[in-house]
């Protein structure tokens, strides 16, 4: 099922051509351009209080284009700022954390054209909206995906992997059950995993996950689900040990 906010294609047009995905790229590009213009309009029309944007300036853009696309367009715009424009280190660091593709031919069309102070304020509102969702990220991970074998561990799915409508902690936590991608030294990428919230079993790629969850952040509901999933294997291990002793 497609996202209600439309596709967000994060690779170059050249890559899209190679994989016969130009229609996806074209639609994503069109929406990115519309989003950038909507941000400019929201800033331009915002009621001013001491020259600051209204507290809900970003709301209409986020509701129409989604947080994921809005962050993508804003991050791209920060990276497109010339060296003579001094964005704060915090904003630059934030923009680096969001994958965008440098594009000298098409990127200028969805670069937000506004005063730096207003751009920073709009980014602040967008980040607040994102943070209010309470999603897991690298900060809650004890290990990365290339530190050790992750089979049998609870993995944190990257928000960028999920459709925005599925953004929730319940959809982020998966128990890795197998696949060559579990081994950081393995050549394969596939990881087979079970969703803790609903028991769905499916295949993902190693890069779809941020890392191994630090279990101090494991919610109570997830602890119960995890115990239920691990119980049969623990019982099998006990039975095997008993058989060995007999």
Q: Residue locations for each model-derived region?
A:
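Gram-negative host-targeted secretion-system effectors, predominantly Type III and Type IV
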Residues: 1-246
